[in-house]
Regions:
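A short, structured loop/turn motif at beta-sheet edges
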Residues: 32-33, 65-66, 90-96, 115-124
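Intrinsic-disorder/low-complexity, polar/charged segments enriched in Ser/Thr/Lys/Arg/Asp/Glu/Gln
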Residues: 19-25, 58, 70, 84, ...
């Protein structure tokens, strides 16, 4: 298991399950419908996806969250330091599952699967990042997985706001 970064680490776990896969789990105090909206509505996604400690902003967020749809996310402080991430949605089941490709690395890109399971008004989220090879997994490093702790804490804040409405 990789180390936890957030103050509520008992709620987020990051585990390397094979030499090609990492799985993150977290329980959110919100219904699956709201968690899905936060993952699928660009105006909400922009508010939580980039960890604050990185000091960057999500400059552009284009998402067509449906099976066969595409996404493109552009990060950076200014146009000279922009990084683009893009891919396709392989499967989307509202309030239950989103599967997408990460194509910025070409053939070495991963496939991300997010599943949502609601129980008693809370949602268990399981996010799997599967790489095509061990070498691709190793090249990706653990930075993104470690940043997930802060990102999910930010998602918690957004979900609390949405739940209060």
């Amino acid at each position: 298991m990789l180390a936890s970064r957030d103050s509520d680490s008992r709620r987020t776990t990051v585990r390397k399950t094979s030499d090609r896969e990492v799985v993150v789990t977290r329980t959110f105090d919100a219904p699956a419908r709201l968690v899905f909206e936060a993952w699928s509505r660009p105006e909400l996604f922009k508010r939580w996806w980039v960890p604050r400690f990185m000091g960057m902003t999500l400059r552009s967020c284009e998402m067509d969250v449906r099976t066969g749809g595409k996404y493109r996310l552009v990060f950076g402080d200014d146009p000279a330091s922009e990084m683009a991430f893009f891919g396709n949605y392989i499967e989307v089941v509202p309030n239950q599952r989103i599967v997408w490709t990460n194509e910025e690395s070409g053939d070495e890109g991963s496939i991300t699967t997010v599943t949502l399971e609601e129980r008693d008004g809370k949602t268990l989220l399981v996010m799997s990042e599967l790489y095509p090879t061990r070498e691709a997994f190793d090249a990706a490093g653990t930075g993104a997985q470690e940043a997930t702790h802060e990102t999910f804490a930010q998602l918690d804040e957004l979900l609390a706001e949405l739940s209060a409405r």
